[in-house]
């Protein structure tokens, strides 16, 4: 049985005008909106990978939950397990490592969920429920 490769994703959020907003970035080819996500390097903890991806792909820093919000699995192009973390954004950079080929956009929960694949929509809605309760 082939091994499962690990990835980490992060849902960066802020509260603005009493509404939860989530930061999405374009894919590396600019063909859609995603949350920052990437491979967990050898010897790296998934949480640390999530922090790194938020900075590299979106230019965001903040407070990341110690435990993932959840996990989903991807079967295409090799089996992958993706741990999904939540980050309360405290710093937004104007320029970041991948800003030449990625755009960043803040969206309210319903708009962000509509842009994302089904496996991530559940996490976005769960985040909304947690923050508004």
Per-region residue spans from a language model:
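Conserved Nudix-box catalytic region and its N-terminal flanking loop in Nudix hydrolases
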Residues: 18-61
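Amphipathic alpha-helical interface surfaces
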Residues: 46, 50, 81, 120-123
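Short arginine-rich
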Residues: 60-63, 122
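Conserved N-terminal beta-strand and adjoining loop/helix that marks the start
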Residues: 1-22
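Active-site-adjacent beta-strand/loop module that shapes the phosphate/pyrophosphate-binding cleft
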Residues: 62, 70-95, 105-107, 127
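Nudix hydrolase/Nudix homology domain
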Residues: 29-33, 89, 94-133
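Residue-level signal for short segments within beta-strands and strand-turn junctions
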Residues: 12-14, 26-27, 88-89
């Amino acid at each position: 049985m082939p091994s499962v490769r690990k990835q980490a994703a992060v849902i960066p959020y802020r509260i603005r005008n009493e509404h939860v907003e989530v930061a999405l970035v374009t894919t590396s080819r600019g063909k859609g909106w995603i949350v920052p996500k990437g491979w967990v390097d050898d010897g790296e903890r998934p949480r640390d990978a999530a922090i790194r991806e938020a900075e590299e792909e979106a230019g965001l820093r903040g407070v990341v939950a110690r435990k993932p919000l959840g996990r989903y699995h991807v079967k295409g192009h090799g089996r992958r397990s993706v741990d999904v973390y939540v980050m309360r954004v405290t710093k937004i950079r104007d320029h970041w490592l991948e800003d030449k080929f990625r755009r960043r956009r803040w969206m309210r929960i319903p708009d962000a969920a509509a842009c994302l694949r089904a496996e991530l929509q559940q996490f976005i809605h769960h985040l909304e429920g947690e923050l508004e309760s």
